[in-house]
């Protein structure tokens, strides 16, 4: 599954709404109805950002605009304790926010031979926002915001196609579990 997570800031005219909670409730209800609709839950369905924003804007006459941040993710169920390669296809382009990397990030996991929890991230080739491709690397956190690269070139990323290819890696554990199954987000 492709998971879509949104962070919405809806702006509204308070004189046209009974309360902020009323606006929040109707926006939430409309988003949930859209998420549950056949438009979003059929094979080959596409998330349309402009359609989503229109649903938010049209939820209540008091809403004047919205700024919505969208994040997409896939849950990877790794083959534990064995070398395996992975391909994750998102079907949506990745935005290069930072030429120096860290545009995508995984949840934590453990690999054979490294005692620390590691994370997967990227760096665009040529350090350019116009780059179509990038490489993947593993890093650990020395402190809360102090990443240290553990291993470079562990895979590739195609920013235009939204595809991630991870070279053979021996994952021995993950920081996240869903119904007792180890996953990497």
Regions picked out by a protein language model, each given a short descriptive name:
Residues 132-133, 140-185:
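Surface-exposed interaction regions enriched in Ser/Thr/Asp/Glu
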Residues 62-64, 73-122, 126-130, 172, ...:
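Polar low-complexity, Ser/Thr/Gly/Ala/Asp/Asn-rich disordered segments used for subunit assembly
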Residues 118-120, 136, 164:
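Hydrophobic beta-strand residues in large extracellular and virion-surface proteins
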Residues 15-19, 28, 37-38, 50, ...:
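Generic serine detector
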Residues 1-87, 160:
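Acidic, low-complexity glycine/serine/threonine-rich segments
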């Amino acid at each position: 599954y492709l998971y879509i997570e949104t962070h919405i800031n809806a702006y509204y005219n308070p004189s046209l709404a009974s309360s902020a909670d009323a606006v929040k409730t109707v926006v939430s209800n409309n988003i949930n109805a859209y998420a549950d609709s056949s438009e979003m839950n059929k094979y080959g369905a596409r998330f349309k950002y402009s359609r989503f924003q229109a649903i938010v804007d049209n939820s209540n006459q008091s809403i004047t605009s919205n700024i919505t941040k969208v994040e997409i993710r896939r849950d990877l169920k790794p083959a534990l304790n064995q070398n395996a390669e992975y391909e994750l296809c998102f079907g949506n382009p990745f935005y290069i926010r930072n030429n120096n990397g860290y545009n995508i990030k995984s949840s934590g996991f453990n690999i054979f031979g490294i005692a620390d929890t590691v994370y997967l991230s990227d760096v665009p080739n040529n350090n350019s926002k116009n780059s179509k491709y990038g490489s993947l690397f593993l890093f650990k956190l020395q402190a809360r915001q102090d990443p240290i690269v553990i291993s470079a070139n562990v895979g590739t990323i195609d920013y235009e196609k939204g595809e991630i290819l991870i070279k053979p890696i021996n994952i021995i554990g993950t920081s996240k579990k869903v119904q007792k199954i180890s996953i990497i987000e």
